[in-house]
């Protein structure tokens, strides 16, 4: 079956414009899109636009036979072949034309389109990035790049190109919506809120805008304001099931289980097949201890006609309940099914993988090569330590290692404010460093240009950028000396921490690696380029992360303390006293009453940290030993190095 030309697809004429902006518009003039304008090519192009792909291909074959050097004809033949249904053959022909003209941005744009159609989104993004590098004003390519980047959760990349497009079209509402969504995913909360409120002012009855703003407010712990947005949705659309689900989730997170149940039932009475409302009710049943009822609800979701997002959430929930019931083999089967399903959204069909070991290994090596003792000393000579205002207290560690518990305990101290997971260091890596230094090299190489290009003030700007993001995220209390940043895998940024905040404490939480691997695999986590969606990639990423940490410790004079999660559970007062002494703060017994805090954790650990300390999470991996056996050999050296055992 041949694909039809959608209004947002590239025009078959090869102009590089969307169909709706070219021959999809009745007023659009004929164009050869840069081709050698022979009569046969013009005729073939008209046939392409009309959807007569077979006839167009026949003519283009003839042109190529007459002149094999006609690269445009070879390219359009690839387009005709792909539009005619033979996408693989079409891609190969387009690649061949690109090989002949590697700096042709149109050819790269069209190749990216078909790669995206076949699911090779990563390759498509790379082609589009090259297209706009060759032709910076190629806005159609940049639009497509933004779209694909957001589909792949590459929101920093998307934001970078949205900013370029907004400089050309500052009033484009679609771009502002995409910007707001990217800011939401990047946790740039103040800018996100500003964008959504501006959009809502123009379209006050747009339900999707209120839902997204509610999500953003919920993500900052502003539950009452989030609730107001969902209530607005219900005023616009009474009984809106998505709003009722979000309200039910808010109530469950606040441990108001009866109200959560009422809202879920209200929604199901109106839409009995809404998968997420069944999920909300199943969570309530789990909280109430009615496990078999919850499992039955979740099994119905698993087999119902719902999207993958709902099915995956239900499978994780099912696994959690089966784990509580000590039905470990069934639990692992549910978690395994969830991860296998969830991988599909990240799968690059060209490589057949969702996570590239080679690319991630190369990134770790890049950081090691850059952050050396000599280079850090040279860069720090341009940046005196900060002297005023609240400063970051970095809590680093792999996801599910105990960073949330540590932060909750420390933030109960009257001089420490809980900042949660802050995106600032990641944003510096992804785009802010290169933009601030105005260097074409990506991070960290762009930092090397600071002394050469007279950009010494750029380091001050990067530090201010981080503090600005922290303030926008409401992580900073001016009355307190410290604010925490517990973004998972921030240990990758220890070199950047040492450069920008040399006096800031770094608290590294470690836990038995097998417990971390199991806990990551049994929760829906996308940190570390979605490494947690497979046991093999999880183990690989953990080992490589520790190699990077060892490099940082060897190359830098860090203000660094390591805490074992198990020690924190077994001797909380002793470990907290040691940590506070390391930070330079006096002991305060409120650190042991963290579970009484009104502050809500916004991570997968939100239920656990609302309780006093419990030790059931220690050595949980033993229940799943046979399922973890494939990764034990890779992890054994790290396990032993950290003082743990597999015996």
What are these regions (language model features)?
Residues 14, 400-401, 510, 569:
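Alpha-helical architecture
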């Amino acid at each position: 079956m041949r694909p039809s030309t959608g209004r947002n697809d590239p025009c078959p004429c090869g102009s590089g414009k969307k169909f709706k902006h070219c021959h999809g518009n009745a007023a659009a003039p004929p164009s050869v899109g840069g081709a050698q304008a022979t009569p046969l090519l013009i005729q073939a192009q008209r046939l392409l636009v009309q959807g007569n792909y077979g006839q167009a291909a026949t003519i283009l074959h003839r042109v190529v036979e007459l002149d094999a050097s006609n690269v445009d004809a070879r390219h359009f033949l690839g387009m005709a072949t792909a539009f005619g249904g033979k996408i693989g053959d079409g891609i190969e022909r387009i690649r061949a034309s690109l090989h002949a003209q590697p700096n042709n941005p149109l050819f790269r744009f069209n190749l990216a389109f078909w790669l995206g159609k076949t699911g090779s989104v990563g390759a498509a993004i790379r082609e589009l990035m090259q297209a706009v590098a060759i032709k910076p004003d190629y806005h159609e390519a940049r639009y497509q790049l933004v779209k694909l980047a957001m589909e792949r959760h590459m929101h920093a990349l998307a934001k970078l190109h949205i900013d370029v497009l907004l400089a050309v079209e500052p009033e484009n509402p679609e771009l502002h919506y995409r910007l707001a969504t990217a800011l939401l995913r990047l946790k740039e909360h103040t800018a996100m809120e500003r964008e959504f409120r501006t959009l809502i002012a123009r379209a006050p009855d747009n339900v999707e805008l209120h839902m997204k703003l509610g999500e953003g407010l919920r993500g900052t712990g502003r539950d009452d304001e989030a609730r107001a947005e969902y209530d607005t949705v219900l005023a616009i659309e009474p009984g809106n099931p998505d709003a009722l689900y979000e309200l039910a989730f808010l109530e469950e997170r606040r441990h108001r289980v009866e109200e959560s149940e009422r809202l879920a039932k209200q929604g199901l009475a109106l839409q009995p097949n809404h998968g997420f409302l069944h999920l909300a009710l199943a969570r309530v049943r789990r909280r109430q201890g009615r496990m078999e009822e919850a499992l039955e609800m979740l099994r119905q979701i698993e087999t119902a006609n719902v999207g993958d997002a709902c099915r995956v959430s239900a499978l994780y929930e099912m696994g959690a309940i089966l784990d509580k019931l000590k039905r470990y083999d069934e639990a692992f089967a549910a978690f395994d099914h969830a991860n296998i399903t969830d991988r599909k959204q990240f799968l690059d069909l060209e490589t057949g993988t969702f996570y590239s070991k080679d690319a991630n290994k190369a990134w770790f090596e890049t950081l090691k090569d850059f952050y050396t003792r000599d280079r850090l000393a040279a860069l720090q000579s341009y940046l005196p330590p900060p002297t005023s205002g609240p400063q970051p207290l970095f809590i680093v560690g792999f996801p599910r290692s105990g960073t949330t518990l540590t932060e909750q305990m420390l933030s109960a101290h009257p001089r420490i404010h809980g900042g949660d997971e802050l995106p600032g260091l990641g944003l510096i890596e992804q785009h802010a460093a290169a933009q601030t230094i105005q260097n074409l090299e990506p991070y960290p190489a762009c930092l090397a240009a600071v002394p050469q290009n007279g950009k010494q003030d750029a380091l001050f700007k990067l530090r201010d950028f981080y503090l600005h993001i922290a303030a926008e995220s409401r992580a900073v209390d001016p009355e307190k000396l410290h604010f925490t940043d517990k973004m998972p895998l921030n240990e990758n940024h220890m070199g950047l921490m040492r450069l920008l905040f040399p006096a800031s404490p770094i608290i590294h939480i470690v836990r038995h690696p097998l417990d971390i691997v199991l806990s990551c695999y049994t929760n829906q986590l996308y940190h570390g380029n979605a490494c947690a969606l497979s046991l093999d990639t999880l183990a690989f990423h953990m080992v490589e992360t520790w190699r990077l940490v060892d490099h940082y410790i060897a190359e830098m004079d860090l203000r660094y303390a390591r805490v074992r999660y198990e020690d924190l559970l077994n001797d909380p007062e002793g470990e907290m006293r040691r940590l506070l002494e390391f930070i330079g703060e006096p002991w305060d017994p409120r650190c042991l009453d963290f579970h009484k805090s009104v502050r809500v954790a916004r991570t997968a650990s939100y239920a656990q940290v609302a309780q006093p300390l419990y030790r059931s999470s220690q050595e949980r991996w033993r229940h799943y030993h046979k399922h973890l056996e494939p990764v034990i050999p890779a992890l054994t050296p790290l396990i032993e190095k950290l003082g743990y055992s597999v015996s």
